[in-house]
Amino acid sequence: MDSNLVNTEDTLVSVIKDVTTDFRGAMCIDSFSVEALLQAIEVYPGRPIINSISLEEYAPGVDKIDAVVAPTCKHDPVYIALATGPKGPAITAIEKADLAKQIYEKCHSKYGIRANQIIVDVNAFPIGSESDDDMNFAMESIKSIPLIKKVHPDLKVSMGVGNLTNGLA
């Protein structure tokens, strides 16, 4: 939840309090603001799912893993990890698996995050938006799944299938 119209930190906390009054399911907490995520996690009554972490730069010299995982890992959350690095989103299956490995290794070695706490989002791009005729974004995303499971069998994988057809209608 991010907006130029409201104070994200206050609004996200308010929404979580209101929604979780009668709701005990899992909730994915999403914000570009690390401060908003921290405040939201403090009031969330369950185990949060945090969207998202990656190896892309959050601030000069700080990637999103360090910015988000360091202050939130004490809450034992599940993290959605985007297959995105300093150069942007991974395109090929091998690039996606390589970034998943780097993300897992950094999260595990530096913060003690277990593989079953990470859901790798393979960043599915729309079919037909490839600039290279030999590239198939959908197949690259699908082919990345077993490669990511080879990194660690407990890593989970997600793919926004709605993204595959975005813009085709």
Predicted regions and their residues:
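Glycine-rich, proline-tolerant flexible connector loops at the mouths of alpha/beta enzymes
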Residues: 1-25, 124-134
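Generic beta-strand/beta-sheet core signal
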Residues: 1-6, 30-32, 51-53, 80-82, ...
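Distinct, well-ordered alpha-helical segments
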Residues: 8-16, 37-44, 68, 95-96
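Short, acidic/small-residue loops that bind anionic groups at enzyme active sites
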Residues: 23-30, 50-56, 146, 151-161
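Glycine-enriched alpha-helix->loop->beta-strand junction motifs that scaffold or abut catalytic
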Residues: 24, 42-49, 73-79
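Catalytic alpha/beta core domains of metabolic enzymes, predominantly
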Residues: 61-63, 72-169
